[in-house]
Amino acid sequence: MSAFTPASEVLLRHSDDFEQSRILFAGDLQDDLPARLDTAASRAHTQQFHHWQVLSRQMGDNARFSLVATADDVADCDTLIYYWPKNKPEAQFQLMNLLSLLPVGTDIFVVGENRSGVRSAEQMLADYAPLNKVDSARRCGLYFGRLEKQPVFDAEKFWGEYSVDGLTVKTLPGVFSRDGLDVGSQLLLSTLTPHTKGKVLDVGCGAGVLSVAFARHSPKIRLTLCDVSAPAVEASRATLAANGVEGEVFASNVFSEVKGRFDMIISNPPFHDGMQTSLDAAQTLIRGAVRHLNSGGELRIVANAFLPYPDVLDETFGFHEVIAQTGRFKVYRAIMTRQAKKG
């Protein structure tokens, strides 16, 4: 997180305008500009645990991680700089939350890549903070307005749900596969053996569908779920509760908050961070799994067939198997043996 994103580079063109401002940074915070920009005061709120990790090291308690921002998170701020995410419902959840807390008269800046759909911010905020485009560079747009009316925000209205084979899946904006089970997860689920026992870790759990589907056929497994996303953590908790499944769910940057070892680690790892393609999380997952698997334990992941995971699996575990595949996806299995690097 040392190099600035294109969106931050656009903001830096206006850095003189922010020197006297008390700024709340929010949205898709993929670099540490909130900690480095010269301002009168800076706060940051994020729903992404890995972004909070970076910012909190430099900003301390002025960087906050949660699903819903509170009045304390925006205290004394007179300016919002919002980084538009690729997911419009996610932007609506976050902006309605933040604008319901900030005082009328707050300066509102929205910045984002054109391909992310940032221009739709104008319509979204038209009734609360009419926006005008004030800059365009690096294939990004920067919009400015002033808060004229606070929206009414009710987080409960953003919840959704769908059913998969009789299971109830609870979802929130920003959660992967919010509108239904994705093809990759379906393929991974098809490989899970009924009546499995032991401790299972679901990394990048999303809405929790892998775990509840696994638990239905293997009720004796002991589940732990983690994700970098606050909406995913809350959605997984709700999905487990809706299906009467027990499990521990918490925020973690891959294994950063995970303790202990498991008999099986399952994952449909992400390869996008915001608008950027990133293999870091999956490679960290594969390499770190050996420190969290019992002897004979198994890592089982699904990934797009074109992604270069076989080499990392072989380098880490000594070997791997492809146990299911389609034209687009492969399910990989690697076993913790003496060949595996112990990290």
Swiss-Prot record:
Catalytic activity field: guanosine(1207) in 16S rRNA + S-adenosyl-L-methionine = N(2)-methylguanosine(1207) in 16S rRNA + S-adenosyl-L-homocysteine + H(+)
EC number: 2.1.1.172
Keywords, ordered alphabetically: Cytoplasm, Magnesium, Methyltransferase, rRNA processing, S-adenosyl-L-methionine, Transferase
Effect on the protein of changing residue 202 to A: Abolishes affinity for S-adenosyl-L-methionine. Loss of activity
Cell compartments where the protein resides: Cytoplasm
One GO location term (cellular component): cytoplasm
Source species, domain of life: Bacteria
Record annotation: effect of changing residue 268 to A: Reduces affinity for S-adenosyl-L-methionine. Reduces activity by 80%
Family matches, as InterPro entries: DNA_methylase_N6_adenine_CS, Mtase_sm_N, rRNA_ssu_MeTfrase_C, RsmC/RlmG, SAM-dependent_MTases_sf, Small_mtfrase_dom
Cofactor(s) this protein cannot do without: Mg(2+)
Biological processes per GO annotation: RNA folding; rRNA base methylation; rRNA methylation
Predominant cellular place of this UniProt entry's protein: cytoplasm
GO molecular function: 16S rRNA (guanine(1207)-N(2))-methyltransferase activity; nucleic acid binding; RNA folding chaperone; rRNA (guanine-N2-)-methyltransferase activity
HAMAP family on file: 16SrRNA_methyltr_C
Subunit structure: Monomer.
Free-text function comment from the UniProt entry: Specifically methylates the guanine in position 1207 of 16S rRNA in the 30S particle.
PANTHER family according to UniProt: RIBOSOMAL RNA SMALL SUBUNIT METHYLTRANSFERASE C (PTHR47816:SF4)
Membership in a protein family: Belongs to the methyltransferase superfamily. RsmC family.
Name the UniProt record assigns to this protein: Ribosomal RNA small subunit methyltransferase C
